[in-house]
């Protein structure tokens, strides 16, 4: 679903931002 995809994108972006 769109919500699931959004969560995956948000999660990935969050991990990248946290790593930086």
From Swiss-Prot:
InterPro entries: NAD(P)-bd_dom_sf
Other known facts: On the 2D-gel the determined pI of this unknown protein is: 6.7, its MW is: 28.3 kDa.
Protein name listed in UniProt: Unknown protein NF028 from 2D-PAGE
């Amino acid at each position: 679903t769109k919500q699931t995809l959004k969560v995956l994108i948000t999660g990935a972006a969050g991990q990248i931002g946290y790593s930086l």
